[in-house]
């Protein structure tokens, strides 16, 4: 949690860090990823059989090696919009017997050469946990139950035996399952009303938890601020002893929200993720309101928020139907850093956050047949995943603010937009880690820092301009490591992310 005092442009900014004031434990799942059958995310991204850079499974070794440095705890699969017409059974068994199907989300052909077993094997090689989305478009409850049985079944039953026949004796124990994806959207096959979705989601959840009570089920929300979010929460967050429930455990464990931000202008781009902060706050209140109105007892586990699609994405410059391959700038990297600061500040309410997507599609990591490129947005992800874990701690920022245009415009009425964006963490190793984004395009900001002690390790991400990119054959944006003695004010460079690290 970071509190804020607004200063004039003439005042000296300050940051006060309080390591003894722990706010909440950070769920490492806020550094989760997402892989969809879209563009080159799967085919030519994580899976490229026949390429000299791939292993015996067809998995790109350079991609795996890079992703391992991010220590990604969970990866969502296989969609996304793709999920509304995907049938998992098409993607298991002998590859020469798998049918190719028309793909209606991105208007292509799905070969099904990469499916459930391949993805779960890839997760094991990467060292991450899978998160599956169920087909709420053309899919059925029987199909969903069969998929869970295939992945998790231990008995002498048809789909558990089919898994064994396909070469996997032990269950995969897939824990996270989403009840559809963006079913409210007009772009979806089988778009639903909030009334129809809520009824269907609750009934599916009952059946799924009867089959496997250990599942973590994620309700499909909108952006956290919509009537859809309130209605679905109100009708699905019921007491365990409700007459509508047949489960001894809560049916809904998380509520999903999605948001993408972007602007062609730097400052609206860099401040746009503050919309996500307000969305998290509103969603958290809606969860509490639904529980209060439905008489859910306080001892029943409270659902957390699953922000399972987020990123900087301009769908005009990176069209989804054309693969959504963004060329990210330093401005975008700073926006991603603000996104991550938001997640650290709001860790109390977050159970997961999945950047969309992991490879090639609006991604920090791009592939060619010959290798990989780490985009500008890679570096904030790397620093946060490595250092911003443990406990969110109290911090106070005093700073002047940016007073110009915001995107979306409503940010201006509900959030302050300081020149410095800050979050602070106390790691399990006893180190304080403070992430500071200076969004100012022209000015370094000299800041007093109360709480720093001893030698401070400094990691800085910046470039010559906010338009700097790593996609022109050279790395214009990277991490530079240095030290600071912790004495006097610290000057945060213009248009930069700085991570300060010292022993508490």
UniProtKB/Swiss-Prot annotation:
Purpose of the protein: Alpha-L-arabinofuranosidase involved in the degradation of arabinoxylan, a major component of plant hemicellulose. Acts only on small linear 1,5-alpha-linked L-arabinofuranosyl oligosaccharides.
GO aspect biological process, one term: L-arabinose metabolic process
Record-given protein name: Probable alpha-L-arabinofuranosidase C
EC number: 3.2.1.55
Main location: secreted
Pathway where it operates: Glycan metabolism; L-arabinan degradation
Any one Pfam family match given in the protein's UniProt record, by short name: Alpha-L-AF_C
GO cellular component: extracellular region
Gene3D superfamilies documented for this protein: Glycosidases, Golgi alpha-mannosidase II
InterPro entries the record matches: Alpha-L-AF_C, Glyco_hydro_b, Glycoside_hydrolase_SF
MF term (GO), any: alpha-L-arabinofuranosidase activity
Glycosylation sites: 152, 181, 269
Gene: abfC
Family: Belongs to the glycosyl hydrolase 51 family.
Coiled-coil region(s): none
Localization of this protein: Secreted
Swiss-Prot/TrEMBL catalytic activity: Hydrolysis of terminal non-reducing alpha-L-arabinofuranoside residues in alpha-L-arabinosides
Keywords of the record: Carbohydrate metabolism, Glycoprotein, Glycosidase, Hydrolase, Polysaccharide degradation, Secreted, Signal
